[in-house]
Amino acid sequence: MDKTLINELGDELYQAMVQRETVTPLTSRGFDISVEDAYHISLRMLERRLAAGERVIGKKIGVTSKAVQNMLGVHQPDFGYLTDAMVYNSGEAMPISEKLIQPRAEGEIAFILKKDLMGPGVTNADVLAATECVIPCFEVVDSRIQDWKIKIQDTVADNASCGLFVLGDQAVSPRQVDLVTCGMLVEKNGQLLSTGAGAAALGSPVNCVAWLANTLGHFGIA
């Protein structure tokens, strides 16, 4: 895919985000788009966000469960960039109707690092050594793709369907909790909506972070 089209699609997704409008799936438009093309589109979208004054504060790993991978026909996760415009503190109101289009909520685990991880060759032990703490996180994903009709290239291009997220207020050392068996409950007004465990994410959330570091290492990014 040539750079002109990549920039046009990245600009289109950025404008969709700003104007809170959806676009037709990129994969339905009759041209070939690879996952690598999609990452370049997401970087163009990120360039527009940074030019508007946002700054990168972290990264998001998506498509970590076997169920979602099977749905999208892939065998690996994807990633996107988190900016300071996306984060909210525990107890702080989120202006969802003002910022998002078709939100969905998910429970996550956030890793706060005390030093960069640069792949390839990053191991689980490296991840634990580099982690200051882990924090429960409430992610509200969003898609600029119409009706969430996404293939893997669509969600990758759309910054891994990043929306907003809330960091919890209880931080613990990753060595003080079993991240594989650690469970999470998502409730709404006291009603249980979903449950999950760390093992559902590539066998362990630590595996996810190692995957991300090693994947980014191929691009020279820590």
From Swiss-Prot:
SUPFAM superfamilies: FAH. Pfam families: FAA_hydrolase (PF01557). This is 2-hydroxypent-2,4-dienoate hydratase. Belongs to the hydratase/decarboxylase family. Keywords: Aromatic hydrocarbons catabolism, Lyase, Plasmid. GO terms for molecular function: 2-oxopent-4-enoate hydratase activity. InterPro entries: Fumarylacetoacetase-like_C (IPR011234), Fumarylacetoacetase_C_sf (IPR036663), Hydratase-Decarb/MhpD_sf (IPR050772). Conversion of 2-hydroxypent-2,4-dienoate into 4-hydroxy-2-oxopentanoate. One of its GO terms (biological process) is benzoate catabolic process via hydroxylation. Gene3D superfamilies: Fumarylacetoacetase-like, C-terminal domain (3.90.850.10). It is an enzyme of class 4 (lyase). Coiled coil: none annotated. Its EC number is 4.2.-.-. It comes from Pseudomonas putida. The keyword Transmembrane helix does not apply. Pathway: Aromatic compound metabolism; benzoate degradation via hydroxylation. One of its GO terms (cellular component) is cytoplasm.
